[in-house]
Amino acid sequence: MDSSAKAIFLEQCGKNRGYRDSDVRGFQPEDGVCLPGGPEVRLSVVNMKEVCRRVAVENVEVAFSRDAGRYICDYTYYLSLPLGTGHAALIHVPPLSHWLSASLLGKALRVIIQEMLEEIGKVQTQSTAA
């Protein structure tokens, strides 16, 4: 994540293509593809936009994103989503700073994760009612 970021980003999806940079050990997906033949986009069942709408933590911006970048985070997210049948989340956090202490970040993450769990509960309730 960009070290100048000033918000926590909740990522809705992982993408299969566009991986151009190598990781710190030199690994780069062949042809820039995470999973040959895989779907272009995989979505989390957690409605991150709704979670963002409901989360409020003192002076911490929480933002919705559909682009985790084409690097290790997005690659890992894309591959993890089917393992939990979509019950996965990627939270990009900014570095600790004068405006974001470890304590405040911890508080924000607790609130965000609680909202995500509530959102998953809604999805499960809707699927059993159908």
From Swiss-Prot:
InterPro entries: Peptidase_C15-like (IPR016125), Peptidase_C15-like_sf (IPR036440)
Pfam families reported in the protein's UniProt record: Peptidase_C15
The protein's enzyme class: hydrolase
Catalytic site positions: 11, 73, 92
Enzyme Commission no: 3.4.19.-
Keywords: Hydrolase, Protease, Thiol protease
GO molecular function: cysteine-type peptidase activity
Example GO BP: proteolysis
Family statement: Belongs to the peptidase C15 family.
Protein's recorded name: Pyroglutamyl-peptidase 1-like protein
